[in-house]
């Protein structure tokens, strides 16, 4: 996993990171905050929408359907119409209370003709622990892989996986040139890496290595 941050990396850096780490059938980019939330209240800069534009990615908008039914259509329409090209190609409804609740949301959304690619019921097991600064780091969760596997298996029946894959395959090719140094490592850089020091942008390490550095990790 990598961080795509236009604020620190610039659009060019985001594209380079995305392309160089996309050696897979499908690349999934998870947004943070609200879809259009970025640098300021009157700019999309550094928002998830901004990143989607840089990478030319189709967007699946996940909506919290708890405590709403017909109003969810107004929310979805607002996101889609906020910009001429919102890049939103489908919806996933989350935290549904019942089949009746799902049917009400579907009925409200039907006139918008936005594909609904998933309807996920409320389930406390479909969450990862968090605290005031965000999710608990992976290094502090010994059973994280097992949790993710369990969540994935639970979600499969509620998602239109084939349609999601089809949307991903319709995206056009993108490319970015990355210069790789052929010189041997000239400098060794020590980096603290353990349970206390673990939040890094790994593209920084890649950049250092491309420019002749050898990274040595240690625990203080």
Locate predicted features:
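Short, aromatic/basic amphipathic alpha-helical patches
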Residues: 1, 103-110, 204-208
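ATP-dependent carboxylate-amine ligase catalytic core
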Residues: 1-55, 63-87, 99-103
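Structural motif
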Residues: 28-30, 60-62, 64-65, 92, 94-97, 190, 192-195
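Short, structured coil segments at secondary-structure junctions
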Residues: 55, 112-113, 211
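Short hydrophobic alpha-helical runs that function as membrane-insertion/retention elements
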Residues: 59-62, 117-119, 216-217
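Internal gly/pro-rich beta-alpha loop/helix module
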Residues: 69-181
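Phosphate-binding active sites in nucleotide-utilizing proteins
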Residues: 185-220
């Amino acid at each position: 996993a990598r961080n795509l941050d236009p604020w620190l990396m610039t659009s060019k850096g985001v594209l380079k990171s995305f392309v160089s780490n996309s050696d897979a059938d499908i690349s999934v980019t998870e947004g943070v905050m609200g879809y259009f939330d970025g640098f300021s209240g009157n700019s999309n800069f550094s928002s998830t929408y901004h990143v989607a534009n840089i990478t030319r990615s189709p967007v699946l908008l996940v909506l919290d359907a708890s405590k709403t039914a017909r109003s969810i259509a107004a929310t979805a329409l607002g996101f889609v119409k906020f910009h001429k090209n919102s890049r939103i190609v489908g919806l996933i409804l989350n935290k549904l209370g019942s089949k009746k609740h799902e049917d009400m949301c579907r009925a409200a959304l039907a006139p918008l003709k936005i594909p609904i690619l998933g309807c996920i019921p409320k389930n406390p097991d479909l969450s990862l622990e968090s605290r005031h600064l965000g999710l608990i780091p992976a290094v502090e969760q010994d059973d994280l892989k097992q949790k993710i596997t369990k969540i994935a298996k639970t979600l499969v029946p509620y998602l239109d996986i084939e349609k999601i894959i089809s949307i991903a395959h319709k995206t056009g090719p993108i490319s970015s040139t990355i210069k790789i140094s052929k010189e041997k490592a000239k400098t060794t850089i020590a980096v603290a890496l353990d349970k206390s020091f673990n939040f890094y942008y790994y593209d920084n390490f890649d950049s250092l290595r491309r420019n002749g550095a050898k990274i040595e990790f240690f625990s203080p």
